[in-house]
Amino acid sequence: MNVRKDALKDLVTRFDNNITAYKDGKNAYNEHSCRIEYIDPFLQLLGWDVPNEAGLAPQYREVIAENYSNKTDRPDYSLTLRGVTKLFVEAKKPSVDIDTESAPAMQARKYGWNAKHKISILTNFEYFIIYDTTTVPKETDDCRVSRYRCYHYKDYIDKFDEIFHLVSKDSVYSGEFDKFFNDTFKGEGSQKQQVDNLFLNQINDWRVKLSNELYSKGNQYTSLEKLNDVVQEFINQIVFLRICEDRNLPLYHKLNETISDRDALHTKLEELFREADKRYNSGMFSGENIIFDLNNNVIVEMIEGLYYPQSPYMFNIIEPNMLGKIYELFLTEQLILLENGRMGLAKKKDCANRSVVTTPTEIVKYMVEKSLSNVCKGKSPAEICNLRIADIACGSGVYLEEAFQYLQAYCVEWYLTNEPDHLIEIGNGKYKLPLDEKKQILCSCIFGIDIDIHAVEVAKFSLLIKLIENETEPSVRDTTPILPELSSNILHGNALVGNQELAGKRYSTDTIISLVPYDWDEMPADGFDVILGNPPYVTTEDMHQLLSDAEFTIYKNKYKSSHKQFDKYFIFLERALQKVKNEGYVCYIVPNKFFKISAGAKLRGMLSNHLISLDDFGAAQLFEDKTIYSSIVLLQKRVQERFTYTNVDSANDLWLGKPTDSIELNNSSLNDLPWKLSPDFEFLATIKNIESVCVSLEKVAEIFNGIQTSAERPKPIYWFSGDEIINENDTTVTIQKGNKKYEIEKSILKPYFKPTKATEKGLTTYTKLSTDKRIIFPYDKSGHLISIERMQSDYPGAFAYLSDYYDRLVPKSVSSSGKRDVPNATADTWYQYGRTQALTAFINTPKLIVKVMAKDNPMYALDNEDMLIASGGTAGYCAVAKKNDSSYELEYIQAWLANSYTERIIQIVGSDFEGGFVSRGTFVLSSLPFVQLDFNDSKQKALYDRVVEASREVYSINDMLDQCPPKQIETTLVRQKDTLIKEIDGLVSRVYRLDF
């Protein structure tokens, strides 16, 4: 740092010696000279590679500087995170007083705001000013509005550490920049509105106003579907023309010129559309024209809203991928007719109950590079045009845009090496392909499918905007039409349902319309080289609500991965593998829970031999305002032998290729069981070493869930706590429920383990269990429901109590007023539990009670009292008992489960929950590895015997502690118990290491 400060001191001294001349407006000292002599070196002292000494490809350069001589309406410097722009620097000559003038500040703020950056820098070297660009720039703002920091050159050395922390390359590349400014510039309100939210709100406002105007005309506009179509089309047309204007592309005349004469507005606008259709010819302007059905005020308001001072938009700064993300949110809503007869917006059915998330740019770029680099390597541009890249749930086309950009960049690099004269220079060492070649790549290589027709139109629109990026009027002069027609590339349909799935079946027209079956014959016959994207995440429960029975049935019948409570992304993964070529790749970002959950078994089995790499974000969060535990899966249709597993903390680290916890493993280690994946290679080696002597725990132990009464809320019916017992004798218990007393027979009661008080919680494995709760158990020793007749004769008190709660207990299948879901219930069995699995397991069966959700205190506690337990999903308990023919005592199984090695496996294969909690339900427990001992080996037998013996010593100590001994004895007993538990853990750990 001192070396940097010394160099900065030289810069400051030289500037100070010449400042009078520099600030003289008559002097020839200009911005060009200031950049070369002062601003470039200053940025380099902040770590930024301004001259690209690293020799990075144009798309990955740290600093993109605009030509000094070719001044455009672009920021002078773009500082990037491996090509992803993070902030702009706007330079001025020293004679421009940026400390007091408003125009330079407005320029810097508008640049940053339109790019959705947190900050922008404005400097003439005399001052280095940082602006907060999360606030909307207003025409009336002076230079002090949103000024976050202002440094004078004489303060640079003293303040260098602070400046370095804020805007250095190290800060940006470490992730500190994002973290600091995300925390610093929090807040909401009209002034804090960022470009995407403001533009989205604006176009949604247009949708409503346009639709109300058209709906009032009647005729064809009374159809909501029609309205949605024509309104979106008109908005796209207006926005496209405005973008072309800011990018200096040819137009018949400017959009705002059409509103100068209100009387001629409709004619001029229609003329502009017609000429745009001739020149661009993408189909965007060839549809129905609604101009003459709109009044002047609506059109004028729209057009004025796209120009300063009404709005601060700069469409040459707003990136195409940001427009795509804005439209992604636009697509979540549709026009509806409100009760008051006016048009409004409402969430589409498939978006109503879930948040729509947009994938971070770094992740999109990483996935595109990771998958496309495999198929592009070594190819010429002519061969590149033979590639077929698809997103089969493309939405707004974010992944397709990035894939198109990657292919362009690859071809530019190839030409720079092999045929540089083929390229067109666009300034400062940057080059582009001729427009015709870009069109060829787009039309030959990029394909998309989406079930939402409006998403299809947005994806086409986004790709066309991407196509004209870096184009100017001279570069398109000789190209007619400028744009291609993409109707053969981006298609409407359900990628999961083809016409062949409907063959031979009779569906109503409405069902077929809702299914939107896709004709795969419209796509390349031999499949795709790459399918990539972020497929829909929709749970089975949500699918039942959102989809027709016909559609859900097709998914269940067609896709092997539609197992148990599957998610929709399961079948997208399966479909993608089906639709790539034999050497093709699939790259998806999906929730990582499929590694572990029971429903993911079929999918795991399907993917295990095709996995190339797995980037696991664990509990790290990638999406704003949405908790999703994510992973990036790269597959190849060809069978793989090895794959790379990477544990990642942030999108930045992945995109930058920073060293991460990464290991290479055999695909043969994966199957349909939960995947045991960890960055701890040594631990995985230990697990691999015991595979040959392991069986799953379910082979040596019974593993079962607790009961489910389905009568817990608002207050439990079947069970009661000690606080509710008002009297007890040898045969009955009297309880107070509400205002009534009930005398219930003890012979129908069982102890019930359900910790509800603070004193009952925090239990661990070797805690002695007790409970003051009891539950009515209306079943015999064989697990059969006790009949009504016997209930009335043998347990009249219990039956009278249950009868008083008949309205709460009666199943839905018995009475229309019923509230409980009870399978197979009848009028004679109305009092049975909601679920009846494993009832006999609670009769005369010692067991371990397992707390399903645990963090630092897993519990596998021994119960010899036949306690019933509650099965409450992740919030409840399950149980483990000894199999009748097992050689292993329950004490040894308990020690195995409580062992630190076992816990590490559970941390890997159990489902993660917020706060570091991990679930260990019956599915996870059943699949745990269990090393089988050789009881003929004296060392192994001795180790086993000692584990059982030490465990029983712990139980004896628990009994003694139950007697509340004096403190001195208690301290000694607790210490002895802890010593025994450590000994038990050490002995079982030796088994894991096969160290007998």
Residue ranges of each PLM-predicted region?
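A short, conserved, highly charged catalytic patch centered on acidic carboxylates
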Residues: 1-119, 127-165, 175-182
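Preference for the N-terminal adenyl/adenosyl cofactor-binding alpha/beta module
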Residues: 2-25, 93, 163-408, 445-455, ...
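SAM-dependent methyltransferase catalytic region
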Residues: 28, 34, 51-53, 57-66, ...
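Metal-dependent nuclease catalytic cores in nucleic-acid-processing enzymes
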Residues: 39-44, 105-124, 431-432, 462-469, ...
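Polybasic, glycine- and aromatic-enriched phosphate-binding surface used to engage nucleic acids
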Residues: 93, 100, 119, 570, ...
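Mixed-charge intrinsically disordered linker/loop segments at interdomain junctions
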Residues: 112-201, 646-680, 686
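Polynucleotide-recognition surfaces of large bacterial nucleic-acid defense/processing enzymes
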Residues: 272-274, 278-279, 283, 462, ...
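Non-catalytic DNA-recognition/assembly elements of restriction-modification systems
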Residues: 394, 532, 672, 676-678, ...
